[in-house]
């Protein structure tokens, strides 16, 4: 019995790529070698999302719009995995200017309801292109 339990616990969990159709083609497609989300053992790991408008491929100049786009893009990955913002357990926010923190928080609060996920916000020197914010999410039903 013990050998069977050990063998079962060593089995690799199936890892599934989550790629929303909106990410696959068009101006919003990055062509970068990464997967927007990985689902394994019921936990979704959302890769860093920026505020690129998926219709134009551009990042808005208005910061609140950039934050909304960033969260909407992350939301597409959550939805493609059958999850939503209410399933988020951890969020990492990267900002190129910590002075933008209060403005980010105002938009962020409209997406995440109580109990809100654990969150870390980090100031960074640079993000891809003109992005001022990048967000990663870990979610689980």
Features from the language model and the residues they span:
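N-terminal presequence-like segments and the immediate start of the first folded domain
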Residues: 1-72, 76-89, 95-141
């Amino acid at each position: 019995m013990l050998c069977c339990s050990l063998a079962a616990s060593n089995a690799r969990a199936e890892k599934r790529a989550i790629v929303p159709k909106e990410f696959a083609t068009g101006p919003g497609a990055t062509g970068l070698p990464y997967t927007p989300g990985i689902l394994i053992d019921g936990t979704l790991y959302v890769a860093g999302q920026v505020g690129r408008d998926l219709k134009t491929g551009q990042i808005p100049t208005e910061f609140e719009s950039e934050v909304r786009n960033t969260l909407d893009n992350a939301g597409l990955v959550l939805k493609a995995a059958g999850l939503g913002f209410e399933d988020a357990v951890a969020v990492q926010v990267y900002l190129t200017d910590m002075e933008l923190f209060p403005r980010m928080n105002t938009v962020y609060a409209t997406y995440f309801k109580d109990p809100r996920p654990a969150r870390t916000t980090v100031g960074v020197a640079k993000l891809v292109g003109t992005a001022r914010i990048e967000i990663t999410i870990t979610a689980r039903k």
